[in-house]
């Protein structure tokens, strides 16, 4: 690395540290740490063991952020000092480059912890795809999205499982529900929630005309045992049906598929992946709890948005991302303006750039 490159890298690192400091609000962070430490010294702190463990975990996370920031600051200062000494001692160049590499690695990991710091970002995720109107063309678009997300999940180390699959009449899907199991699944996939628009020459149109199709994607965190969502048995209607794989493969001779309807809200969920009715009911119940929790969070968000004003609704006319196959190739996120011309790579699951851009946009917004 040339000295000019090293100087530029040091300037960029200082700018990043300034951004980290601003987003962290160190003064507030110090106050929060002090409050939690004082709380933990109270005589009755451990009377509620679950609450105490939660507080202890929160304190460790805050201290981790605080200590890591100061470690980065010290490493950055040391790097600057080495640069000043480089004119007198060329042998310091190797140590300087090692410091820069170490700082880059720490900053990259630290940036991810800041981007994924919202509640439930670390949870597993449930993702649903619902094609819009448009028949076979729209249902095929839903199937392409299913393939994209499955490949993304597999490439990034997630365990991907189909919870429910409703095949299209001629091709594609009517709906599909997937689970993603692994660290930060919800935090990463929440960027995909919204309407996805496709523009292409339809393979189902003999006249080879250009078609526009839509599909909506819903993403929910899979709730763990620390979050309670009350669902009364009287509020649930359960139907059973024969389940099978995509395209009707392996159709069961007994009714193992389960469909749950939450009567007060009208929410419907179903699971067909398990070989037993009991297993599918358990999976469907988890999906229902996640949907009810999301519904409650959306209500709270709407109340806040009503106070803020200027809330843009997610409708078929306000897609979050467009995938253009013709007359040119381009995938563009309309929230962040991040775009890629390599449509094939995106459809093969390479959506990390869109996710990173969204997470940074959320922090800046």
Curated annotation (Swiss-Prot):
N5-methylglutamine: residues carrying this PTM: 249
GO cellular component: cytoplasm
SMART domains for the chain: PCRF
Highest taxon of the lineage: Bacteria
Main location: cytoplasm
Gene3D superfamilies from the UniProt entry: 3.30.160.20, 3.30.70.1660, Release factor (1.20.58.410)
Coiled-coil region list: none
Record's subcellular location: Cytoplasm
SUPFAM superfamilies cross-referenced by the UniProt entry: Release factor
Record PTM: Methylated by PrmC. Methylation increases the termination efficiency of RF2.
PROSITE patterns found in the cross-reference section: RF_PROK_I (PS00745)
Signal peptide: none
The keyword Chloroplast is assigned to this record: no
Function description: Peptide chain release factor 2 directs the termination of translation in response to the peptide chain termination codons UGA and UAA.
Assigned protein family: Belongs to the prokaryotic/mitochondrial release factor family.
PANTHER family: CLASS I PEPTIDE CHAIN RELEASE FACTOR (PTHR43116:SF3), PEPTIDE CHAIN RELEASE FACTOR 2 (PTHR43116)
UniProt protein name: Peptide chain release factor 2
